[in-house]
Design a protein with these regions (language model features):
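A conserved beta-strand/loop capping segment in the N-terminal third of enzymes
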Residues: 65-98
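Nucleotide/phosphate-binding site architecture used for ATP/NTP-dependent chemistry
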Residues: 50-57, 64-67
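Flavin (primarily FAD) cofactor-binding/catalytic cores of flavoenzymes
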Residues: 2-39, 43-45, 87-193, 197-445
Length: 445
C-alpha cells in the first residue's frame, strides 16, 4: 500500500471531473488522479444525433470562466487543431455536440491524471484516508479527499420498466443502436430537447421511413428554452450564492418556475421541426400525419405486439391509447451516487427526503474528519439551483472545489455582478420600516 496518499481521487471522468482535472493540471504540487471504467473518454456518444447542437456558449468550457489563459480552453483547442479562423467564418450561433465532444476528448488526451479502464469497486475510510479498491491495482488507492462525478442515469418511467428492451429504450442509446425503423410505428415519450431531436430525425428518415410517428409529452405544449439575458442570470455565481441561502420550500418553488431556463427546446430546433411538420403531407403523400400529444401523463404500458401505451389527457382528463412497434424514451435522467460508495453510505448525512446535502463548497456532509471531504458534482440541484446540472458553471464549481481543497482562493469565484440585485438592501431610513409595518398584512400582486 502506498505511504503517500493522493490529495484528491476523482470517481468518474465526465465533463465535470474533467474540468477539475484540467484546472489542477497547473498545480503539480496537488496529487490527483481520476478513475473511470470506460476505456477512453466519451460524452453521451449515444446522443450525438446529426445536427444536434450545444445549448450553451462555447466560452462556458472546462476552464475559461475562471482561468482564460489555461491551455485546456476551447479557443486553444481550435487554434491547436487549425480550426480557429474557419470557426469564426462559420458564424454558428451554437457549436455542435460532436465538436464539443471532440474538444473534451482532446483535453482528456492531454491530461496525465486520468485513469481509464479502472473502475472503482468500493471506497472505505481507514486510517485517516479514503481507500479505493480499483480494478488493476494490487493495493488500495489512498486519498485524503474524494470528488464524485459519475454522471447521470437514464430515467425509465415505471410504466415502461417491463417493456422489451429491443423495442423500448432510452434516447441515450440511439446512436449506438442505430435502429432500423422503416415501416414501424414509432412513439417518442418526452417533450424536451432530446425528444424534439429524435422526432426531427424520424421526420428526416435518419433511421428509415417510419409508418407512423407519435410524440407524447407531459408538458402542456412543446415549449422553448428560455435563453433571454435576464434568465441567463440564473447561471451566474452571484445567483447560485443567493439561491443557496433560501429555505428549501422557496428553492423548490423557484426551480419549478425556472424549468424552461434549462429544460426547454432550442428555438432553432422548434422552428425547423415545425417547418418539417408543415411540409410533411406534401413530402410524404399518403402517409399518416405525425401525431403530437402534449399534456399527456403516461399511466401504463403493455409489451405485447404491438406495445400499448395508456396516457391521460390533462386537458379533459380522458384516457387515450397509443399503439407502437417501437418506443423511444426521452424522459431525462436521475442523479445517484455510485454503488462503490455503499460502504460509506451510513456515514453520509441525508435530508428528510433522503437526499445528500452538498454544502457551499460542493462537499457532502458526513461524520468523518472535516479535513477529509467528499466533493460531489451534479448532485445539488435543490441546494445550488438550476445551473448545477448544466455545463454553464462547471468551471466555476471546479474553482470553488479547488479553492476549498487547497485552502486559499487561487481562482476568482465571485463575479461581483449586481444586475439584477437579488436581495433587498437594509432599510436606510426608519420611515421605511414604519411604512412596511403599516402595510405588512395587505395582499400584494
Amino acid at each position: 500500500m502506498s505511504s503517500q496518499p493522493l490529495d484528491l481521487a476523482g470517481i468518474g471522468i465526465g465533463p465535470f471531473n474533467l474540468s477539475i482535472a484540467a484546472l489542477l493540471d497547473d498545480h503539480p504540487s496537488i496529487k490527483a488522479q481520476f478513475f473511470d471504467s470506460k476505456p477512453s473518454f466519451s460524452w453521451h456518444s449515444g446522443m450525438q444525433l446529426p445536427g444536434s447542437r450545444l445549448q450553451t456558449s462555447c466560452l462556458k468550457d472546462l476552464v475559461t470562466g475562471v482561468d482564460p489563459r489555461n491551455r485546456h480552453s476551447f479557443l486553444n483547442y481550435l487554434v491547436q487543431n487549425g480550426r480557429f479562423y474557419d470557426f469564426l467564418s462559420a458564424n454558428m450561433p451554437a457549436i455542435s455536440r460532436a465538436e464539443y465532444a471532440d474538444y473534451l476528448g482532446w483535453v482528456a488526451q492531454n491530461l496525465t491524471s486520468l485513469r481509464f479502464s479502472c473502475p472503482v469497486r468500493s471506497v472505505r475510510f481507514e486510517n485517516g484516508c479514503f481507500e479505493l479498491d480499483v480494478t488493476g491495482h494490487k493495493t488500495p488507492v489512498r486519498s485524503r479527499n474524494l470528488c464524485v462525478g459519475t454522471g447521470i442515469t437514464p430515467y425509465i418511467p415505471p410504466a415502461c420498466s417491463n417493456l422489451p428492451e429491443d423495442r423500448c429504450f432510452h434516447s441515450i442509446e440511439m446512436m449506438h443502436r442505430q435502429p432500423d425503423l422503416a415501416g414501424e410505428r414509432v412513439t417518442v415519450v418526452g417533450g424536451g430537447q432530446s425528444g424534439a431531436e429524435i422526432v426531427l430525425g424520424l421526420l428526416d428518415g435518419t433511421w428509415g421511413e417510419p409508418a407512423g410517428i407519435t410524440w407524447i409529452s407531459r408538458r402542456p405544449n412543446f415549449e422553448p428554452l428560455d435563453e433571454t439575458p435576464f434568465t441567463n442570470q440564473y447561471f451566474t455565481p452571484g445567483y447560485v450564492r443567493a439561491f443557496q441561502s433560501l429555505d428549501e420550500s422557496r428553492r423548490r418553488e423557484l426551480l419549478r418556475y425556472q424549468k424552461l431556463a434549462s429544460d426547454g427546446i432550442s428555438p432553432d430546433t422548434l422552428n425547423t421541426l415545425y417547418q418539417r411538420l408543415y411540409e410533411y403531407p406534401l413530402s410524404h403523400p399518403g402517409r399518416p400525419v405525425p401525431e403530437l400529444l402534449p399534456g399527456r401523463s403516461l399511466y401504463a404500458a403493455s409489451g405485447g405486439e404491438p406495445i400499448r401505451l395508456l396516457s391521460r389527457n390533462q386537458m379533459d382528463q380522458r384516457f387515450e391509447e397509443t399503439q407502437a412497434d417501437r418506443v423511444i424514451l426521452c424522459t431525462g435522467f436521475e442523479h445517484r451516487l455510485p454503488e462503490c460508495l455503499e460502504p460509506l453510505g451510513g456515514r453520509l448525512k441525508l435530508d428528510q427526503a433522503g437526499r445528500h446535502c452538498p454544502d457551499e463548497h460542493f462537499a457532502l456532509e458526513w461524520d468523518g474528519p472535516a479535513d477529509c471531504r467528499i466533493y460531489a458534482v451534479n448532485q445539488g440541484r435543490l441546494s445550488h439551483g438550476v445551473a448545477e446540472s448544466q455545463l454553464s458553471l462547471m468551471c466555476w464549481r471546479s474553482a470553488v472545489i479547488i479553492n476549498h481543497l487547497i485552502g486559499w482562493d487561487r481562482y476568482p469565484v465571485d463575479d461581483g455582478g449586481q444586475m439584477p440585485r437579488w436581495f433587498s438592501e437594509p432599510a436606510r431610513h426608519s420611515s421605511t420600516e414604519r411604512f412596511a409595518d403599516e402595510h405588512r398584512h395587505q395582499t400584494y400582486f
